[in-house]
Amino acid sequence: MKFASCSAIASCFAGALFLTATTSKADDWTIESNADWSKNIKSAKGAEISKGSVAPTGKTATVVTRIHSSDRKRSADSLVVTQSAIWQNWSPIQNIGPSNLGDAPVMLTVGPNNYWMFGRYKGRQPRRKKGQKQKPLPPFQPKSAKLDGFDMPLQTTPYPNQFNAPGGLKKGKGGYHAWQSRDMKNWVHHGPVTEGFSKWVTSAEWVDGKAYIYYDFPNDQDPHVYVDENLFDGVPGKNMGIAVKDPSHGSDAGFIRDLKGNMHVIIEDWSPINASKRSWDSPLAGHAVSPNGLNGFVFKKPPVDKRTKPTGKTATYKHPHWAKEDPKRFKTNIAEYKVHEPEQEAFGDWAAICIGGQYYLFGDYDPIGGHQMSVGWFTSPSIDEEFTWCDRIGKGHPDPDVAFAQGQFYLATQQPTDYVSPGPWVETVEVRVGVDTDKDNLIDEWTEWSEVKEKYDYIKGFSKQISRSPAKLDLSKLPAGFGFQIQMRLTDSTENKSKPIVEKLSLSFKE
């Protein structure tokens, strides 16, 4: 539903320019559905209403509501603006993290100015011109160094913006290593955190001052976990063994702890697809929850289910690692799956984050037809409900992870390009509210125009649970009245594909 001009809207409503109040909680005035928007809008310019939201069709839009009236005089408290949860506000940046971090990056935010990344440690590789033999690099001579925020001895490395702490000087064990940063620019290497058999690290979480580092063993099978109380010592933590007994094949799991302390895992489920032909991803994801993150995971309903129709046939595929890496538990590399038609989209390598109760799942997206892979993401107001598709970004097999750091969100991939976002909120939204003080259906006084936006912050003790402060206009200084009107200006201020999509306006009144 598009609105071309103020006059067009006026003719559509052809009559009264005010509404009698409909009650909700404390008689709040809420606009959040297509019917609400159509009923409450007096005029709009450059705006489109679709699926219960309003957004600019071009660079700018202006929306004016009808006067919301009541028989009794009331005092307004605040106006809250809620945007779509689609979260398209991502911009490309060069790879974050250490330049020699290899394989799929795993991120862990411990708190403000305390950010960690895990990955394989890639050695220096000399450049070789075509037709010439590779020449060895000259030995690097480290020097003592100092870096703000680190009170330990440091040494320079041949890699830019990277330093070795004492733990980083210890010999690797064939698995993942740990790097720490205070600013997401300079990185301190603290050495190995997993071993050769545990090299398939998929996710990390922070629990009561300890790092839980999850890995598949063998590859694409049951998640196992280390509990590491000291990420600085260059020694892997305590290997707790298998954490999740995966009833399917697939793993590449992402873990997230909820605010009650329960650990959730989102896992690939290869039962409906030949994953070997779809980048080892699947249209189906599993979800399980545990009270401690170490064991006792109970499976729930799937958070992502994009299966097509089962044919009733069963077929097989082969995995290259299972019997080789864990011959005691896996006697064969052959697995069965249920054939589905038509062709299915595939997702995987899951990573999760929650912002003010809104959950997001990021992962691989392998579309139908063998087109370019990318990062795809889903969202849900509850981790126990099915997630809704949002969008995709980038090129190549991403194996992504997502984290909150330095007041913004980082999306890391194993491709040359990563992404950064200020959050799901998209600028710019300006609002003002007017009041009819004498019941003549005319506005007598307006607030000043004010920009509103959401704000995000850390929650102490949680890595992937982020607090959200609403986009709110304080109306406490507005005089009491019988009618209220909202004016809103929307400006697409970003250089990416996002734009401000307003899903809800809620004007609350004092009791």
Predicted regions and their residues:
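Bacterial N-terminal signal peptides
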Residues: A8-T20
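Sec/Tat signal peptide C-region and signal peptidase I cleavage site
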Residues: T20-A26
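Beta-strand-rich ligand- or partner-binding modules
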Residues: A26-I96, A405-G407, T413-E511
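Hydrophobic core segments of beta-strands in well-ordered, beta-rich domains
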Residues: S78-Q83, D103-P126, P142-G168, H190-E195, ...
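Blade-edge beta-strand/turn elements of extracellular beta-propeller
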Residues: N89-I96, M184-E195, L231-D246, N292-P342, ...
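Surface-exposed intrinsically disordered loops and tails
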Residues: R124, R128-K173, K306-P342, L361, ...
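Beta-propeller blade signature
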Residues: G175-D183, H224-L231, S282-G293, S374-I383, ...
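Loop/turn-rich, solvent-exposed surfaces of beta-rich toroidal or solenoidal domains
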Residues: F330-T379, A412-W425
